[in-house]
UniProtKB/Swiss-Prot annotation:
HAMAP family: ProB. It is found in: Cytoplasm. This is Glutamate 5-kinase. It comes from the Bacteria. GO terms for cellular component: cytosol. GO terms for biological process: L-proline biosynthetic process. Catalyzes the transfer of a phosphate group to glutamate to form L-glutamate 5-phosphate. Its EC number is 2.7.2.11. Pathway: Amino-acid biosynthesis; L-proline biosynthesis; L-glutamate 5-semialdehyde from L-glutamate: step 1/2. The keyword Ubl conjugation does not apply. ATP binds at residues 15, 174-175, 216-222. Keywords: Amino-acid biosynthesis, ATP-binding, Cytoplasm, Kinase, Nucleotide-binding, Proline biosynthesis, Transferase. CDD domains: AAK_G5K_ProB, PUA_G5K.
Length: 373
């Protein structure tokens, strides 16, 4: 199954974590980048387009600034990223030019992808670069981003980029062999899971833990990234990036790492964007009946099923949809503001115009703008 799935891949996103990219001195490892460039050149020669999501700017800046530990505050991280990003790209250029490959730097914030027009513009730019045979190297724009606009980590960014460029595969290179039944660093009985058909709550609980001294993402963030892409019908593989030509071997179907199979019913690109790219501005709590109608029958959310409104949001904002226990089970684009929803909640759609003095439609969230999680 793995080999057959990988044969169909024509565009792949490769996420490279700081723990893989950096050497013992904490800076970018030129030997690793040379090996990576050789493997990317091999894939490109076979007709596979490669997009790289690379960490490492903060780590490179930390080395240049002589900082003993990873920066903790946002200003420190931004200063380190400002110093390190140019060094990171220079290292990529030097390594890839040896194989006649050109690279392009793309720096993104969450706001770039949350805005649909900018999302589409970014897609057009990346498509053009790939058509020209150029390897995009994408990173979060750490020098200007604020906490509320952060992707959180590059694992999450790689999942969003996979949707952005419509890749058929996400590869996450990390410092361990893949997803284990337990933490292999503390449990000698932990075994590698070679294939995952569905990301369950049990798997998510077992993947806890934070990042390393040079990176922000632990296995939990990688599992979350895999969960995002499989929902749009894309496979993901988490594997050790420091082994011998592991990228090439994975792409040839060798049994390395953990393969996450695509979901049977996949989200279209727009619904994936709603579910995972836009940051929710608030929440709507629905009653048990409304939850059942939405979850089982794929209907629109009507005001009659709304029990509570949390937060302030405008018409057209993304909101979480919570069940009576406060558990999020859906997200959607609302046709009414929080103040308007507060006034019409619990009422029939036929009463909207009488209550508000106007009416955008019968639905608070139309089913075309609603995504079950």
């Amino acid at each position: 199954m793995r080999k057959e799935l990988l044969k169909k891949v024509k565009r792949v996103v490769v996420k490279i974590g700081s723990g893989v990219l950096t050497g013992e001195n904490g800076g970018v490892d030129p030997g690793f980048l040379d090996g990576l460039a050789a493997q990317v050149a091999e894939l490109s020669g076979q007709g596979t387009e490669v997009v790289i999501v690379s960490s490492g700017a903060v780590a490179a800046g930390r080395q240049a600034l002589g900082l003993p530990d990873r920066p903790r505050t946002l200003p420190q991280k931004q200063a380190a990223a400002a110093v390190g990003q140019s060094r990171l790209m220079r290292a990529y250029e030097e390594a890839f030019s040896s194989y006649d490959l050109k690279v392009a730097q793309i720096l993104l914030t969450r706001d770039d992808l949350a805005n649909r027009r900018r999302f589409q513009n970014a897609r057009g730019t990346l498509d053009t670069l790939l058509a020209c045979g150029i390897i995009p190297v994408i990173n979060e724009n750490d020098t200007v981003v604020v906490d509320e606009l952060k992707f959180g980590d590059n694992d999450n960014l790689s999942a969003l980029v996979t949707n952005l460029v419509e890749a058929q595969l996400l590869l996450i290179m990390t410092d361990i062999d893949g997803l284990y039944t337990a933490d292999p660093r503390t449990d000698p009985n932990a075994t590698l899971i070679h294939q995952v058909g569905a990301v369950t709550r049990e798997l998510e609980r077992g993947a806890g833990g934070s990042g390393t001294s040079v990176g922000t993402g632990g296995m939990a963030t990688k599992l979350a990234a895999a969960k995002k892409v499989v929902k749009s019908g894309v496979a993901a593989i988490i594997f050790a990036g420091r082994g011998e030509r592991t990228l090439s071997r994975v792409m040839k179907g060798e049994l390395l790492g953990t393969l996450f199979l695509p979901a049977g019913e996949s989200l279209n690109r727009r619904k994936h964007w709603i579910a995972f790219t836009i940051k929710p501005a608030g929440s709507i709590v629905v009653d048990a009946g409304a939850r059942d109608v939405l979850a089982r029958h794929g209907r629109s959310l009507l005001p009659s099923g709304i029990a509570q409104v949390e937060g302030r949001f405008d018409r057209g904002a993304c909101v979480r949809v919570l069940d009576p226990d406060g558990v999020e089970f859906a997200r959607g684009i609302t046709d009414y503001s929080s103040q308007e929803v507060e006034k019409i909640r619990g009422h029939q759609s036929s009463e909207i115009e009488r209550i508000l003095g106007f009416r955008y439609g019968d639905d608070v969230i139309h089913r075309d703008n609603l995504v079950l999680l």
